[in-house]
Every structure is written in structure tokens, then in C-alpha cells.
């Protein structure tokens, strides 16, 4: 028996990464998981080294980031890798989630995998927001003020919760210090959730583009899919390096190179690009409390997909109507991102309201109706044949 199988610890690694049977038909969309693992490792390592030179005191936070950029050897590389790594992390995560939506990865027996994935998504958004505030530039200060103020919409106790989060009556030194502490902690929670995600996936194995069980047609992970993953890893690193070395500030906001000033309000307060769709949903609802509920509902609605999708065929590979509505949903999501960066004025508010309605309609109206229609067509075609 090979040593990797006889050793207790190596056998665990072997069963997950070497001999793990994978469907032979999986395509490059299944490589997003390995890229997300790479992104998480990059973020944790660069974050740890940056934390060695960062000061969470509100008077020193902005200056300490500049100190990392100017005085620490290769500090600029750490900072730009960490900042752009967050953007690439979300870009790959959105592609990973789109793959799950398109190929029905949320369907039984992988519902638990999907639920843990949604929790990872929420935790990653929290980590990104906390990290953005730690820079304490102008957009960081006002972003922290706006987002934490959302809790004031909670009846009776909202204002007390906001002051508890701030540690005072405004975003101040205690706010940045506790945000930094949480920002350091959350990635390790995400890493633990990733392990749980991986364990849940290991129970029934990966899905495949055909939407069938496919237990008889599988190949070992190592030798086939490890090298297939390496192709996308190298492509990812090339594109990532182009941003880090040649265009490091493209995905950021110029206002964040101005120290945070509570006395000067920016012309437009916007979060990072990867949070813009949900920011657009928040702004499309005039009522503050309903806007907050709608924004969080836009994330949690992902959890209802296993209940609303009643199709007898997993995934959209062979379903024309579902394909059409899926790509309309993707276009609508991108539109929400664009609207999130626009000023709150006509016609962007109205467009945001229509796009928000279509976003929720996809999960709660279109998916169940389309699955019913396609099931009917499937049974009619089966009977005729």
C-alpha cells in the first residue's frame, strides 16, 4: 500500500486532492474553486505581513498605510497585491456562483454545499467592508459611516446598536480598532468555512455539466484535474500581475488617497465595485428599513433556490428557456452594478427599482414557473417518443 494511503494524515489529503474521483465531463468553470483557494491564501498571507506594519489608531491608520507603501521593503507590492486580490477574489467568486446557478449545483444532494457557500459569500463581503474601512481614506470613513448607519433602521434599538458599533457618537478611534480586529479574524473563519464547504462537497462529489449522477464515469483528481487547474492558475496569475504591476489603482477609488475627514462629504459615496449591485438595491428603496431588508434579502434569496427550482433536469445545459432567463439575470446583475456607481437621481433610481424587481423575480417567480413549463415540455416529449 502506498504511504500516502497508509498514513492517517496523508490519507485524508489523498482522499480529497489526489485520488478523489471527479466527473470526467467537468469543464473549466469547475476550476474556479481552486482559484478561490489561491485567492484566499494570497489574502491571508499578504494581510498578515501588512498587519505587522499597520497601526489601527485612527490618527495613524492612513499614515501607516503610506508607511507600508513608501518605507517598508516591497510594501507597495504587499498593499497592491492585497487590494487587487480582494477584487479578483470577488470576480472569481461571482463566476463560481454563476457556474453554480447555471449548472444547478444548489440542487439535492449538494444543498448543504450551496448553503455553506452562501455563508462564505456573506463572510467575504463583511471582511472586504472591514478591510476597506481600515485604510481610513475619505471613502473609507464615509463608507463606514453610511453602512453602519443602516443598523439605525432597526426599530427601538437601532441607534443604540450604531453607537455600540462606533464605540462613540461617530466613526472614531474605537471603530477603526475594532474593525481591524474583526478584519484580521474573519479570513480565518472563512478558511474554516471553506474546509466545511470542501467536506460537504466530498460526500457526494462534484456535479457536472450534463446534470447527471455520473458515478460510473469518473477520473482521479491528480494527474488529470490538478494539471487542468494549473492552466487557469497560470492565466489568473498573469492577469493578476498585470493589474498589480501596471495598473494597481484601476479597481480602487481615488478619493481613498485623501485622509478621512468627517467635515468634508465626498460628491458621491460608493463602495468597492464588487459591492455595487447590492448598494444599488439598497438605494432603490426609498424607505430606510425596507431598503436594508431588501439588500440583505438579495443575498439570502440565494438560499431559496433549492426550494423554487422544481425542474426534473439539473442545470441549464439542455434547457433553452432557462438559459435565456439566466443570461438576462446576469445582464440585470451587471446593470445593478453600474447603477450602484451612479448618482441618486433620475433616471438611475427608477432603473434601479426595475432591476431590483427583476433580480428578485428571477429567484421567486421566473425559476419556479420556467421549471414547471420545462417539466411539462419534457413529459410531453417523453410521451411522444
Curated annotation (Swiss-Prot):
Its cofactor is heme b. Heme b b562 binds at residues 82, 183. One of its GO terms (biological process) is mitochondrial electron transport, ubiquinol to cytochrome c. Binds 2 heme b groups non-covalently. Keywords: Electron transport, Heme, Iron, Membrane, Metal-binding, Mitochondrion, Mitochondrion inner membrane, Respiratory chain, Transmembrane, Transmembrane helix, Transport, Ubiquinone. It comes from the Eukaryota. The chain crosses the membrane at residues 32-52, 76-98, 113-133, 179-199, 225-245, 289-309, 321-341, 348-368. GO terms for molecular function: metal ion binding; ubiquinol-cytochrome-c reductase activity. It is a multi-pass membrane protein. Its main location: mitochondrion. A ubiquinone binds at residue 202. Heme b b566 binds at residues 96, 197. GO terms for cellular component: mitochondrial inner membrane; respiratory chain complex III. It is found in: Mitochondrion inner membrane. Component of the ubiquinol-cytochrome c reductase complex (complex III or cytochrome b-c1 complex) that is part of the mitochondrial respiratory chain. The b-c1 complex mediates electron transfer from ubiquinol to cytochrome c. Contributes to the generation of a proton gradient across the mitochondrial membrane that is then used for ATP synthesis. Heme 1 (or BL or b562) is low-potential and absorbs at about 562 nm, and heme 2 (or BH or b566) is high-potential and absorbs at about 566 nm. Fungal cytochrome b-c1 complex contains 10 subunits; 3 respiratory subunits, 2 core proteins and 5 low-molecular weight proteins. Cytochrome b-c1 complex is a homodimer. Belongs to the cytochrome b family. This is Cytochrome b. It comes from Monosporozyma servazzii (Yeast). The gene is COB.
